[in-house]
Regions:
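Active-site rim helix/loop that mediates acceptor-substrate recognition in acyltransferases
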Residues: 8-35, 44
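Conserved short alpha-helix immediately C-terminal to the canonical SAM/SAH-binding motif I
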Residues: 74, 99-102
Length: 131
């Protein structure tokens, strides 16, 4: 699934970061399957007790399944879980210029833009959804 979104949404260099993330034990990570039992979307979150925030992490949809509502459902589910578990915590995420508008639909606001952060042509958009 990661590869279907590279290089438009992720840089090739991020694959190892994603793999390392998946072996962590202190995260919540969800996977959506379609009717053929194929993984079509995934994403997680993790609580940062130092600053009382929750990071929305590594959300992605297999590129062959974009525009089918999987990303929306996964994001709604994660935000709902976070607001139930951590009702007084802001939700943070970072994404690119290719997906920040998607997250704006859920109430996330841009706090910072860093040009070419992930790779040449892949800018980082830091976003927050405040409680």
């Amino acid at each position: 699934m990661f590869r279907t979104n590279t290089p438009h949404f992720f840089d090739y260099s991020e694959q190892q970061l994603f793999t390392n993330y998946l072996i962590k034990k202190d995260i919540q990570y969800y996977v959506l399957f379609n009717e053929d039992n194929r993984i079509v979307a995934s994403g997680g979150y993790g609580y940062n007790n130092k600053i009382n925030t929750v990071d929305l992490t590594w959300g992605m949809v297999d590129r062959n399944y974009h525009k089918n509502g999987f990303g929306r459902r996964l994001t709604e589910y994660r935000v709902q879980k976070i607001t139930t578990e951590y009702p007084k915590s802001d939700i943070l995420l970072n994404t690119t210029q290719n997906t920040f508008k998607f997250y704006e639909k859920f109430g996330f606001k841009i706090t910072k833009i860093t040009k070419d952060y992930y790779a040449l042509g892949l800018d980082r958009y830091d976003m927050i959804k405040s409680v």
